[in-house]
Amino acid sequence: MKKMSRVALVTGGTRGIGAAISIALKAAGYRVIANYAGNDAAAEAFTIASGIPAVKWSVADYNACAEGVKRVEAQYGPVEILVNNAGITRDAMFHKMTPEQWREVIDTNLSGVFNMTHPLWP
C-alpha cells in the first residue's frame, strides 16, 4: 500500500502540538484527518490554512468516538495511524480542583486514549 493512501487520525489535531503533528504527517504523504472538540473557528482556520479536514467530537465520550471513527472511515478509508494527542488542563492546584474539573481531565486525557483506540483495535 502506498503511503499516500494511508489515513492518519490525530486527536486534538487542529491546534498546538496536534496541528504540528497533523501538518507533518500530511507533508510526509499521509491523508490526515484532524479531530477537535471545541473551537469551531480555530478548526475552520486550521482547515483553510492546511487543507486538512477537521472533524468534531469529544474524545471523552466513548460513543462519540466510535461514531466518529465510523464516519471518518466511511469517508476517507480505514484509519491506519492514530495519534492520541488530545488533552486538556484545568488550571487549578489539586486542592482547588472540583470533582467535575478532575473528571473532565481524566475523561479526556486518560479515558480518551481508550475511547479512541478501542473502536480501531482489530
Language-model region placement:
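Substrate-binding pocket helix/loop in short-chain dehydrogenase/reductase
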Residues: M93-F94, Q101-I106
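A short, exposed helix-loop element centered on a Lys and neighboring polar residues
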Residues: T117-H118
